[in-house]
Each structure stands twice: as C-alpha cells, then as structure tokens.
Amino acid sequence: MLKEKYSFKEVENKYNILWEDSRVYKWDGKKENTFTIDTPPPTISGKLHIGHIFSYCHTDFIARFQRMLGKDIFYPIGFDDNGLPTERLVEQTYKTRAREVGREKFIEMCHEVIEKSKQEFKELLRSVGISYDWSLEYHTISKETVTLSQMSFIDLYNKGYAYRKMQPILWDPVDKTAIAQAEIEDKVCESSLNTITFSTEENEQIDIATTRPELFLACVAVFCHPEDARYAHLIGKTSVVPIIGVKVPIIADGRVKIDKGTGLVMCCTFGDELDIYWQQKHNLPMKIIIDQDGKINLDSMYDNNRSQYQGIGMTGERSTGVIKEGAISPHYDVIPVRNTRIYDEINGLKVKEARKKIIKILTERGLLTGSTNISHSVKCAERSGVSLEILPTYQWFIKTLDQKAQVLDKVKECNWYPSTMRKRMEVWIEGLNWDWCISRQRYFGVPFPVWYSRRKGEEGKVILAEVEDLPVDPLKDLPKGYSKEEVVPDQDVMDTWATSAITPQLSALAVNSEFSLPDHRYNTIFPADLRSQSHEIIRTWAFYTILKAYYHANSLPWKNIMVSGWCLADDKKKMSKSKGNIITPKSILDTYGADVVRYWTANSRLGVDTVYSENILKIGKRLVTKLWNASKFVSIFMERYQAVSINSVSETMDQWILSKLYKVIEKATNNLLQFEYCEALGAVEGFFWKDFCDNYLELAKKRAYGDKVSSKANLSAKQSLTYVLNTILRLLAPFLPYITEQIYHQLYSDNSVHNRGNWPNKEELIYDKHSEEMGDKFMQILNLVRKIKADNNVSVKHLIKKLMIKANVKEDKLNQSAQNDLQTVCNAEMIEWSENAQAGLITENGKFIVSIDLY
C-alpha cells in the first residue's frame, strides 16, 4: 500500500540523489544505439526564470522517452559563460565597466561571477528533474572549448571562409563593440522628420527630409529617383550643404522612394544601410563624424590615419590596424568646421543631444522648414537596447552571402519540428545582406589565434597559431619563430555565437576529422540526432551551427531540430529581466513541485508561444494527486513486486481497457517520435482520466474485490488493473518523473521506471476490436444511466429496480460478461433488453434507448 499523502519535496530530494548515484542517465559511450542531443547551453547572464525551465523541460521529455525506448542517450549540459552577456552581468554585479578595471582584473571578476551563477543554474536544473549526464558538462570558456573554437577559426581561415576587412559595420556605442546582423532588434521609436533647406550652385532651394539632421555635416551626395519629374532638371548638378558650404553631387538612383519625405535624400556616411550601398556603388567619399562612444567627433575627420576606425584595442593601442589584407581604401573628405560656432556647439555631444542642438541652429538660421513627429523603426542592439551606429572598422567576418544557396540546401535536408520553422530560417537566409561579423571589442571571450607581422617585407601578414600550441592568448603568447617586437597581437575576442555555433562539435571534442582533441568521439556522436531550441534564436544559433557544420565537414550538425515557443508573462510579452515581468522558478517549485511545473511546460505545442498559467499548474496538481490516489487503490489488489501479467484476462471490459491502452501506447509513441510531446501527454492524460479513472476503475472494482464473482472474473480484473497502472506510469514517466518513479518503486520494481528499454510496447497487448466496440457501447449506456440519475437528483450508487435497454439491432446487445459489469456498476437489480421500449434517453449515435425504474 502507498502512503496516505504524497510528499513531493521528500520524493524529489530522494530521487535526485538516487538517480545520480545509480547513474541511470549515464551515457555508455558506444556508437551503437546512441541518441545524441545538442542541448542549448544557458547563457550566464543572470538568474534563470520560469521561461528557461519551459524550454529545457521540452528537451528532457524527448531524452527520457528515447532512453526508455532503449536508446543510449548522449545528453550533455553546457554553460555559455563567455562573451558580452556574461560581461554585462559582471559589470552589473560589480557596478563598474570593463575598461575601468582593465583586462586581466576584469577577466578574474568574470570567472568569480560565473562560478557562482553556474552552481545556481545546476541546482535549478536538477530540481526540475532534467536528466542530463552531468559527466558530459562543458563550458564555452574552458581550455578544451577555447581550443576547439580556435581550431574552428583556423579551419575556416585556411578554407577562405574567414577574413578580415575594414568596412562599415553595426556598432553598439554602449558596449563599444561590433555586433552581427542577427543581434539586432527593430524598435519603434518616437522621433521627428525634419525638412532642411539645401541649395544648388544656381541658388535654387531644395528641401530634404531626414530623421537624422545631426548627420548633414557628413553629407556626401543628394539622391533623387530617376523618374521623379520634380527633380529631373537637378540630376548631374551640384548641391551645397547648408552652413558649411560643402558641394556634393546630385545623383539619380532607383532605390529612392518618390513618395517618402520630399523625394530628395541626403546620403551621409553612415546613417543606414542604404547609405553604405550608395557610398560603395557610386564611389563616394566617407565623412565619419560619430565615434565609437556614440559622440559627435568632428576632429576625427582631420586625422588622416583614421586610427579609431582601424581596429583599436580596448587599451587604446592599435592592435590590428597594420593588416592590409582585404581592406578597403576609402577616400575621406574633411569638413571645414573647425573654429566655427557649429563646431563649438556640437563637437563631443552624444548623438541625441547633438540632434537637438542642430535642429536649434537650423531653426535659428531659417534652414529648418518643417518638423513632424513620427514613429519609426530603429535598429537597436539586442543586448544593450541602444540605437546602433554604422562605423567603418576592421573586423573579422565569416562568409555567408556567397554561400546562401548551399546553406539553404542544408536547411532543407534537416527535419524541422514544426515544419513551419524551416520557412522562418529560409526567409532569414534569403534576407541576409551582411557577412557574419564575429569579432568583438571586449575582454571575456575566445581570443583570435592571430598575430600581425611587423617584419620588414611582410608587414601586416596574418600569423596563425600552430594547432599543437592551442589554446593561445596572443596577448601573452608568441607565434613560433617571432619575437615580441616582431608581432602585433589581435586584441579582439570572438562573438560568443562563434563558439556556441559548434556545440555539436564541442560534445564530439572535434571540429571535424582533421581538427580534434585526444580521445575525441567525433565518429560516435556527430552529427547529433536532435537540436532543441526556442524560435527566437533560429537566426543565430540554428543558422550559425548549420553554417559551420557545412563549412567544416559539408555535413548537417544534426538530423532533427525541435523548436519551442516562448513562455510569455501575463502581459503576453516574452519574460525578461529588463521588462520586469519574470517569474522565478523557486517559488513555483516550492508550491507545486517539479512534476506539476513539468506538466505545465508540456501543455505547450511545439513552436507556439504559451502564456504562463496558474490554472494549468492547478490542473497538473490534480493530475498528480489523482495518479497517487488511483495507484493507492490499485495497490490493494496486488502484491509488491509481483509479476505483471495479462495471461488470465477473460472479461470483456478488461479486454476493452487493454484495447484502449493499445491505442494510447501507439499514439503516444508516434507523437513522441515526431517530438510532439504535448499531443503525447494529451493522449495519455485523456486515457487516464476518462477511460481508466472515470470508467474502468468504477466498473472493475467490485470484481477486483471478489464480491459475488467467479475467481476467473476476479483475477481478470486484478491483472488488468495492475497491468494498466504499470503502463500508465511508464507512459507518464517522461513528463512526471518523480511521482511515477515513487509509485513504480513502491509497487512494481526496485529498478528505475526510467531505465533504458522500459517504454511500453503495444505488441505485448492483443488489440481486440470486438471487445473495444462492445465496451464503447457499454459506456454509452452507462453514461445515459448516470445522466438519468443526475436528472432525478439521486446518487450514482442509488439502487435501480430495473434497467431497460432497447438496442436498434440485435448485434448491438451486450454480451453476458459486459452485462454483468453494467448491472454492477449501475447498481441495478436486473437488466431487461426490450425491443418495444419507446420512452427513455437515446444515445448520441441512436443505437440505444435507455430508461430505469428507481426505488
């Protein structure tokens, strides 16, 4: 017998220890029968919230199912503990900025913070029952990972996929680093559309509307549409920039929108991506007036060396400007503004402050002819939230644009769950217009294994580290054959995605067959079987991982990708610390327990955003309670650890429940093979509540007790109850691992319910279509009897003098076994089958008319 009440806290503590000690989730290390999961390493950027638990549970459902199916599961946990997200956490923790404390001290601070955060993450992931093999834990800042990440870079560089170039890039002036296209979010911001009066050399006034008037000092051309009749006479002429008097060409280009603003556009270097396009297409000069701090810097245009745009390291030393390979050679133009009022008033101001000042100056001079408040989309950094600038700097890139078609082919080779997410990836790839910028001007990340030569005759030559010397830090180490005076180290670090994009290879301990660590398992687990992730990182993690696997090995990184939706807060927005709408998991786990939280996460369909719901948690709690109580009831009729058998099942309604169970096993298995955990749980839960608890337990219990029935009928009920409960526990085990383990241990075996090969096999059952149909008719009649009793305000146990049933056809009449159970469950003294009965309730399918005589 089970205890009266189920204590989830006691049980969770017990099995967290037992599972780890018994190594039930340990990967055996053999290629045969291995199922490899590429898991998302949580970013060390703060505390985990319930939204993180949401997606990690989805992966665990599949891991537990595949393990019980008989697979040897390779299920690692990683921690993404390098890069900008971690740096921001450290800066917030210590209330300082990286540059204020210096590189070495800041890196020490990073290690201190991530160690504490990792322990908190581990405790939380364990507390919700994620079945990782903790011996496979990895970290994106570990020696092994840095080695593999640097191997990846060297392989890509040698193959011509990685290159360094000076070009306009997206710049975050708060975090003071380049970022990639995938790290942008478009925000709708309030602004103003300002109309500025320019003139031509012939003194004709022309109006240009812009949201960035502070950039007019960097104007290098004026554009109109070639079919705009208003300005056809201006094409080929020269415009004069107001205040500073600089002359710029007026050029026709089809990318001008005739109906936007005044139809004239000033090209400034750089306000947006269109400015980049025009500057490069028409070979226009560059006038850079915004610096890396996001301030107006008019002095920079007098610096012919352009040092701040040639890869300054964070210490202020030029670290990578010597490189000439692949660099563009823009011609710069000087703006004659020194010793003028406009220079004095705006130089050194932040961009938004300068914008206000410029509008004021233009208004005072009568050069602002209009200003309209608008809302428009602004490109912002995903992490810092700040508006991005476009600055020309030296950066490292990985090619994407010239490989779109090939990567799209790889995307189509992969199985996407749900399939609609593949289209999202395809749209992203087709819309790419930048190569992937992988260098970051930060401290805490994987260093580029690169130096630049100062030797005479090879100035600027890229020197790669030898593979056998990896990992290297160019700031501390030297390349073979060079002295300190002969090289300049690359001071940048890699974008954290550049490392996270090789998580399948990190698990394999090899980038490909050429670049590997000792004792690698590349041939055993690469490519992986499954990648599980949420949909917002399709354009980053999924895309970059597919790209790198293609470049490194012409392979997919995994065969299947399962994409979860977001967990939304009550306001239907994604949970995030910045929005202040996060829900911490600890309080929910303390209130409901891990199984109930897991139940809530399983009630979300793949790829669909789900609002956090206390109501679903309450339903989950009722399920856990009902499972315990139903098991407690069944345990009355069985000996502990008795053999589970159905070889003596003889009664129709027992065969009915087993036939229903056959279908549920089939449906749940097929759903989980397609990674549809929500549908699988729904099928099992529906069977448990409706078929097993509401119906079968009631009709079988008197036979199970042995009241006025044959020993044969009694044994049939006991075997069926014992077998069905055992199977229900195993079907629910991936979702509710704790309570199913506790009941299974108490009643069925001292082995774990989660053991490999313990998934129910429908072939153990014989599907009996006749018994299922007979049982369904039984249930139609029983439901009408229950309704009649309810309509007469009597309990379901109220004695019936006579139960009268009319069947439309003789073949629908219940057999004697089913009639015996019907008479018992309805508490009827007798059942009369009548061909003449007209009054009574009719079943939905019209097969039966039912009436009763009550005492």
Swiss-Prot record:
Give its localization.
Cytoplasm
Q: Where is this motif: 'KMSKS' region?
A: 574-578
**PROSITE patterns on file:** AA_TRNA_LIGASE_I
Enzyme class label: ligase
Amino-acid positions noted as binding ATP in the UniProt annotation, renumbered to this chain = K577
Q: Name one GO biological process term.
A: valyl-tRNA aminoacylation
EC numbers on record: 6.1.1.9
Recorded GO cellular component terms are: cytosol
Q: Which domain of life is it from?
A: Bacteria
- Give the reactions, separated by semicolons, that this protein catalyses: tRNA(Val) + L-valine + ATP = L-valyl-tRNA(Val) + AMP + diphosphate
Motif: 'HIGH' region; annotated at 42-52
Q: What Pfam families does this protein's entry cite? A: Anticodon_1, tRNA-synt_1
Gene3D superfamilies under this entry? HUPs, Isoleucyl-tRNA Synthetase, Domain 1
Q: Which UniProt keywords apply?
A: Aminoacyl-tRNA synthetase, ATP-binding, Cytoplasm, Ligase, Nucleotide-binding, Protein biosynthesis
Any GO molecular function: aminoacyl-tRNA deacylase activity
Copy the domain comment. Answer: ValRS has two distinct active sites: one for aminoacylation and one for editing. The misactivated threonine is translocated from the active site to the editing site.
Function statement: Catalyzes the attachment of valine to tRNA(Val). As ValRS can inadvertently accommodate and process structurally similar amino acids such as threonine, to avoid such errors, it has a 'posttransfer' editing activity that hydrolyzes mischarged Thr-tRNA(Val) in a tRNA-dependent manner.
Task: Name the family.
Answer: Belongs to the class-I aminoacyl-tRNA synthetase family. ValS type 2 subfamily.
Q: How does it assemble?
A: Monomer.
- Quote the protein name from its UniProt record: Valine--tRNA ligase
Origin species, per record, is Wolbachia sp. subsp. Brugia malayi (strain TRS)
Q: What is the lineage of its organism?
A: Bacteria, Pseudomonadati, Pseudomonadota, Alphaproteobacteria, Rickettsiales
